[in-house]
Structures are given as structure tokens and as C-alpha cells.
Amino acid sequence: CLNRGLGAVPEGAFADPRHEALGWRAYREDPQGEDRTDWDALRIALGVPETGTELTPDSFILEMGFERLNGVDFKKGCYVGQEVTARMKHKTELRKGLARVEGEAPLTEGAEIVSGGKAAGTVLSVAGTTALAYLRFDRTEAGLEAEGQSLSFERLD
């Protein structure tokens, strides 16, 4: 059973390596204590993707911000996907990737994001008026809209 919390790291737990504000994690047979933190809202605010939500089998780890989240090390030896990841890092600029978007009202997961009448991305996870989205960065200059509202965005690569 996964236990999570904020504050001092208890014995047998470890600090979440993705972001210091995510606190600690511990895997135990029985849950200990009750933490009422809204973990989805916290990870969305911090721009941390979740497996099965933002991270799919088709995801490229650099597009999902893994370098920023301590999820890839370019000094380490061999790892699965190393060639593609290294090529993306050193030979090109990311054209697509994870972004935090902010609307005027709550968004709907799966909503299409458009810019200048062209598809520019998709809303992936929502917490209030903040969401994680997958965007084509080359289509963001004309401004972003989803569900009839303007969006601001921040790249998370």
C-alpha cells in the first residue's frame, strides 16, 4: 500500500525524487495515518505527469519533462530508449510536449486546444482552472483556446 505525506520523511520512507514539494512516499502492508492532501491537484500544479494519465506507451520522456523531474540522466550508462532520447536532446528542439495551462473556468479532460483555427493540443488532467496538456509548441503563437475560453500556458520540458 502506498503512503504519502508532506513534512519530515519518516523511517522507511523516501523523498519523492520528482519534486521536493511532493513530499515523501512509503510502501507498507498497512496504510498509516490519513493524509487529506489533494495529490492530483498538487502534481498538476507542479507539472508532474502520471502513468496512465499523461504518460502513455507512446510518450517520449523528454516531451513529458523527465529531465526536469530527475527521470533521465544523460551521464548514466545504457538504458531502454537511450538512442532516441539522446538524439531528441542533442539534435533537435522539442516541437511537442507537456504544458501547464490555465483557463478562466474549469476545463474538461480530453478537450481539444486550438490556436488560430488549428488543433494545437489536448487537455489531459484537470484541477480547477489549471490543467496539464499535450501541446504542439509550433502552434501556440496565435494564442490558445479550449471550450470557448482563452488559455495561458507554460512549457514543462
What is each of the regions a protein language model found here?
Residues 38-90, 94-95:
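A mid-sequence, solvent-exposed acidic-amphipathic segment
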Residues 64-72, 86-157:
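Glycine-rich, small/acidic residue-mixed loop/short-helix segments
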Residues 1-49, 115, 146:
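Acidic, low-complexity central loop/insert segments
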